[in-house]
Every structure is written in structure tokens, then in C-alpha cells.
UniProtKB/Swiss-Prot annotation:
It catalyses: D-mannitol 1-phosphate + NAD(+) = beta-D-fructose 6-phosphate + NADH + H(+). This is Mannitol-1-phosphate 5-dehydrogenase. Monomer. It comes from the Bacteria. One of its GO terms (cellular component) is cytosol. Its EC number is 1.1.1.17. It is an enzyme of class 1 (oxidoreductase). PROSITE patterns: MANNITOL_DHGENASE. Disulfide bonds: none annotated. GO terms for biological process: mannitol catabolic process. Keywords: NAD, Oxidoreductase. Belongs to the mannitol dehydrogenase family.
Length: 384
């Protein structure tokens, strides 16, 4: 069986690629990084190492690569012949691959291919595949064919893969834990059952549990750690103040998840404890700048902080630690990160209230006032 995977970065190789290879797929990685693509073409394999005491190495074979900038026709051809298409490129990049995917679907239609195909966006976002489907639809010549044969099931993915540099451009280190959950209701290729993947009738509880626990938690450690001067997640997790803030934030999101989705309280408490242990993994040195990047996106209305705050308010539940986190994020400075620079420019040029409303989408004056107080509370002293 053939899989096309967009995104040959660490998550693509270190998570999705590993699962697909274990299930017997030949994988064509699609990326614009010529160094990685060339190495995949030449070697047709790469190595994953688990970040724990075992340092177990896993060899992933039967792979190749295509550069979608220089070889778009071959990418279209690969999609036309694929049994599965997946992505791990980042939510902001999905629209850029939509046209190529549409061309691949249209090529299947022209060849009268009557083999169902699922296209799964494995991204840190709610409804990633649904969003990708909407983008792809803009370019389709034969939408009726796509409606019949192409599925875009949403997915939730979870594995910490830190930024890393190795002499070997294909070598990747990952945490042992991984979770990939797929919405079974929107699949077309039902005959494909991936081992190591959970198929569920209702994905939303799992996506929200992951987003509001792992992503909210990871970001909490990163921004709180940055405020206290730490460089890596594992360093920050040695500080009792950071751990206390993390636990408080996850208790607040946990209240929402239990109330909304009827998760068992004790099971969810164990899930939170597992997350804390994962963040404390001394074998992973994950840069705070990686986890804290793109703060404007992370402050979005549907994202890891604002959405739980809003939904807790709707249930008359308080979220003081989440609101404190918004103040901390607004004060995050990373000159290397475009959105961090942009956010600080906005705060320099407009009133704090205006920027809060603009970035978060929050309209309630009382909540804006509360966030403003937290922005001022965590402001760094200005150096003359």
C-alpha cells in the first residue's frame, strides 16, 4: 500500500511515518526541504530514537521523498495512486498544499479510480481535515467525484517531538508516548485499519481533551518558564512555581472537559498526571522558544487558552489561572518569532483593550478588563 505524507519534518518522520511504516505502507514524504527530501530519496530509510532510558532505535524503511516546489507533477501522480494521504505541516500551511491535493483527486477522477481515499490532517487544531477539505474544494474540477470517493476524517495526534539538530538530517528523537485518534464516521476507506490508531465515533471529546490538556499545558509551561528565565521545558518543570501553575491551569480545563464530555474525574486526573510526567522527561530538551512560538495564533478564539475560558464562563465556572496565562502570553518576547514581534508592535501602537479584543475575539468588557489587569501584572520592567 502507498501513503503520501505532507511534511517530512520531525513529527512527520518521528510519529506519522513510524505508524504508517509499521502498517506496511510505502511512504512518499512531500516537503520543500531539499536536504531531507534528497536524503530520503537516496537512503530510503531513517532512524527514530526513543527519548527515555532505553534509547531504543527504530528503523523506518520503504520511504522516499518528493519536493512539492520542484516536482509538483510527481506529487499529483503519487496522490493519484495513493491508498492514504496524511499531513503534519502546521495549520497555517494547509492552504498551500490544497491545490496539489485537488489536482491529485482530479487525476483519480480522470482515471476513473474507484478506490476510496482518506486524507487526514494530523495537526494541532480542531477540525484540521475538515478545514483542509474546504481549502481543497476551492480547486476541485470534479467535486462530485470527491464527494463520493474522498474522505477527510478529522484526527487528534499527540507526541512530543522537540526541535533538534543532528549530523544525520533524517535522525529524529521522540518521546515514547504517542496517541493518534481518527474520526471513524467520515472515513471512506474503511478497509484500512491502522494498528496503533484509535478509531472513534465521536472525535471531538478526544481532540478537546488533548488540546485543552497537552497543548494548553505545554504552552503554560513554556510561557511561564520564559517569564522566569528558563530556556527549556524540562528546566522549567524543575521549578515548583511552574508546576503549580501547570496543575492549576489543567484543573481548570479539566473541570470543563469533565462537565462537557462526562470524562471520569479520576481517569482525567490520571491523564493530567501522565502529561506532567511527560513534560518532566529529562531525556527531552525541548526549547521554550519552540513551544511558545506563534503567540497570536495561540491566543486565538478557538485556541488552547481562550476557548476554555469562554466555555467555562458559559458554565459559570471561574478560570483565574487561565486568565493569568493570557497576561503572561501577551508579555512574551522572542525577537526571532514573527508573531511575538507583531504582538509587541500592536501593543506599542494600540490600547491594550483594543489588542486583547482583536487578538482573542473576546467582547465581554469584564473579561477584557481582567485580562488587561493580568497583562499589566506580568509586564516586564522597561529598561531605559
Amino acid at each position: 500500500m502507498n501513503a503520501v505524507h505532507f511534511g517530512a519534518g520531525n513529527i512527520g518522520r518521528g510519529f506519522i511515518g513510524e505508524i504508517l511504516a509499521k502498517n506496511g505502507f510505502h511512504i512518499t514524504f512531500v516537503d520543500v526541504n531539499e536536504t531531507i527530501i534528497q536524503a530520503l530519496k537516496e537512503r530510503k530509510s531513517y532512524t527514530i530514537e526513543l527519548a527515555d532510558a532505553s534509547h531504543q532505535q527504530i528503523n523506518v524503511e520503504n520511504v522516499t521523498g518528493l519536493n512539492n516546489m520542484t516536482e509538483p507533477e510527481k506529487v499529483v501522480e503519487a496522490i493519484a495512486e495513493a491508498d492514504l494521504v496524511t499531513t503534519a505541516i502546521g495549520p497555517n500551511i494547509l492552504p498551500r498544499i490544497a491545490e496539489l491535493i485537488a489536482q491529485g483527486i482530479d487525476a483519480r477522477a480522470e482515471a476513473n479510480c474507484q478506490k476510496p481515499l482518506d486524507i487526514i490532517a494530523c495537526e494541532n487544531m480542531i477540525g484540521g481535515s475538515t478545514f483542509l477539505a474546504e481549502e481543497v474544494a476551492k480547486y476541485l474540477k470534479n467535486p462530485a467525484y470527491a464527494e463520493q470517493w474522498i474522505g477527510f476524517p478529522d484526527a487528534a495526534v499527540d507526541r512530543i517531538v522537540p526541535l533538534q539538530k543532528h549530523e544525520d538530517p533524517l535522525f529524529v528523537q521522540v518521546e515514547p508516548f504517542c496517541e493518534w485518534v481518527i474520526d471513524d464516521t467520515n472515513r471512506k476507506a474503511k478497509e484500512i485499519q491502522l494498528e496503533g490508531v484509535h478509531y472513534v465515533a465521536d472525535l471531538e471529546p478526544y481532540i478537546e481533551r488533548k488540546l485543552f490538556s497537552v497543548n494548553t499545558g505545554h504552552a503554560t509551561v513554556a510561557y511561564t518558564g520564559a517569564l522566569l528565565g528558563y530556556q527549556t521545558i524540562d528546566e522549567a518543570m524543575q521549578d515548583a512555581l511552574v508546576v503549580a501553575q501547570l496543575k492549576s491551569v489543567l484543573q481548570e480545563t479539566g473541570k470543563l472537559l469533565v462537565a462537557k464530555w462526562n470524562f471520569d474525574e479520576q481517569e482525567h486526573a490520571a491523564y493530567i498526571e501522565k502529561i506532567i510526567q511527560r513534560f518532566q522527561n529529562k531525556y527531552i530538551s525541548d526549547a521554550i522558544t519552540r513551544v511558545a512560538r506563534t503567540p497570536i495564533r495561540k491566543l486565538g478564539a478557538q485556541e488552547r487558552f481562550i476557548r476554555p475560558i469562554r466555555e467555562l464562563q458559559e458554565r459559570n465556572l471561574v478560570s483565574p489561572h487561565l486568565l493569568a496565562m493570557i497576561g503572561i502570553v501577551f508579555n512574551y518576547h522572542d525577537p526571532e518569532d514573527e508573531q511575538s514581534r507583531q504582538l509587541q508592535e500592536m501593543l506599542d501602537q494600540e490600547s491594550v483593550d483594543t489588542v486583547i479584543a482583536e487578538v482573542t475575539g473576546i467582547e465581554d468588557p469584564e473579561t477584557v478588563k481582567n485580562i488587561k489587569q493580568n497583562v499589566e501584572r506580568y509586564a516586564r520592567p522597561q529598561v531605559a
